[in-house]
């Protein structure tokens, strides 16, 4: 049986990848780290935040060509991408049957013979992400697996319903069994610089989540500038967000490397100042295995290997898993299989 090597770092150094089989402990950040308790809104800090757009874009443009992992090393990184994936279905035609099939894929994301040959038996995705109405079927389908259900909430994707309804939706999803809540912020607060309103809204949503951990979706494609992205990231972390997330996947522009660089540097600055680790979730537009490799390399470079664990990193994705499975099969057999062999649901 073939065992995969560890995470490649700085071109030559290697660090061991461990896919944890204690699934619940591997995923829920409150079991590993003190939750981000938040801090009082510091408007002086928010006002000092800058984002050098040209420098960020130059750095991001160099990333795809700077790093290259091949063979066993690439397979190890791709298995890590699966372990930190929020396998997602957010379509208007979702049904309980589709969600059940997606959950079966979450339990067994790669063909058993492939995992056996890779020495990665026990590998699952990080979570399954669905609308509120699909939480109960997902919870039932994942029973005993340790894989948490994440629910999009708070008037997703626009987030423009009354606040009391958004908070009630969070409570309903938690009561139905969701252990992670992906909320959407009011973009107008960012665009008008109303940081107090954004902070208060985020704090109320965090409180409504209770023990479920909360991912704050910034909808970065609608925030106008990278400086707004950086400031919104900081305010949401101050208000207690466990994760910050790029996008709903419904915007015209979703996750990008410049946005990712901006957000993870905000995470690093917040950790340096407070000691709290906040997770990161890029979502939307990450459909190819090669894209996931670039994101993993960037996050490792900027935040370190601790942020490559499922409790601090997630990919919001649907089609990404199929491409990763095709790449792993090619690694083992030398041939690419047809896409229909790797259907999600």
Descriptions of predicted regions:
Residues 2-3:
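Basic polycationic patches enriched in arginine
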Residues 75-76, 95-123, 133-276, 280, ...:
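Alpha/beta enzyme core
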